[in-house]
Amino acid sequence: MKIKMKVLQVIPRLGYGGAETGCYDLAHFLAEENCKSFIVTSGGELLKYIKKKSVKVFRLPVHSKNPVLIFFNSLIISLIIILYNINIVHARSRAPAWSCLIATKLTMRKFVTTFHGTYNFNNKFKKFYNSVMVRSHLVIAGSNFIFSHIKSYYGNFFIDGRRKLLVIFRGINTNYFHSNRIPISKIDNFSNKYNIDRNKFIILMPGRLTNWKGQKLFIESLKLVLIHENSNMQPFQAIILGDEQGRSVYKKQLIDLVQQCRLGKFVKFINRCDEMPIAYSISNLVCSCSIEPETFGRVAVEAQSMEVPIIASDIGGSTETIIKDKTGFLFKRGDVNNLANTILMVMQKDYNSLKSIGLEGRKNVLKKFDVNKMCSTTFAEYKKLIELS
């Protein structure tokens, strides 16, 4: 008798990040495959887009690292598993993963984790806390970079063969991130709202405001670009787009740095954009300047899907998602001069060259990083787990 798949995904918040959109996309994909799809989360902006007839959502404080709440959550998740006869529980962050580990042990169900980051650890306790992400039956790495990280630091968990580790590249919705599907009216409204001069060369740096994303490096590179640009080049307008997420001190540092570099007329801050394809569509160039490795590098993939040239640090997932000098460019991590020179090089390219890079970028994403490929591969692995039950 064929078992109907019922999958419960657990994530701290269902916001606009890579892990969150992956959870959202997979939940609806499973529903379309005639599976029962459930999500446990504490809240988040994407909740309003959930199709309630397809995906059932439970609100729990799974964002909390409090041991008492982690245990409380494990009991409630156990009840959900039993009441809805869940086959597979898929955790996407450490605190909820501990709750899921306890719940799946109690109910004897299959446990899956997606390893979304390198998770810094300074002591044995922190490494133990992080290790929950490799205590599942199936561990999914979002890139070869993360796969290597897991093997290096947690390889002993896979020696006995009881756990499976594999790479499933994250995917994006290429129909959503499509340059031909954005109404001109939305582009005009966005440009007018933020006073963006589209006659200038628009350089976009998306990402939440945090030091490791490299906003300071980006600003310092623009100072050099301004010094070295020539009269034949189009004047530029840079946009730093990202939520400060409570880091008001860091944002003030960025604003002060812009003034120190005399870039007040050239750099604009935008807190957020609920429709990122609009922001990409007005841009001539996208920069991802992380000084620490990205697990996957979602910005690089979204930019390519939107046919916009991308410049990214030569570390982490971006080295796998960008075909160097064909779909985008890589600069030496933390090297302000190398970044500035790369920006200048792109700014000096003609329209046809930039268009060609954009077209190659979209081909690359359609081939390797489409959301349906990510979801179908994950679904196939789920089925294998159930067949082993």
PLM region spans:
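A conserved mid-protein helix/loop that constitutes part of the nucleotide-sugar donor-binding site
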Residues: 20-25, 201, 205-227, 252, ...
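Short hydrophobic beta-strand element within catalytic cores of glycosyltransferases
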Residues: 39, 309-312, 322
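Glycosyltransferase donor-sugar binding loop
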Residues: 39-45, 172, 206, 237-252
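Short His-centered aromatic/hydrophobic patch
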Residues: 91-97, 115
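A short, active-site helix/loop in glycosyltransferases that binds the activated sugar's phosphate group
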Residues: 136-167, 172-179
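A short, well-ordered alpha-helix in the C-terminal region of glycosyltransferases
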Residues: 192, 345, 353-368, 374-380, ...
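Active-site donor-binding acidic/aromatic loop of nucleotide-activated sugar
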Residues: 246-251, 263-273, 279, 329-330
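Conserved acidic donor-binding segment of nucleotide-sugar-dependent glycosyltransferases
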Residues: 324-325, 329-336, 345-351
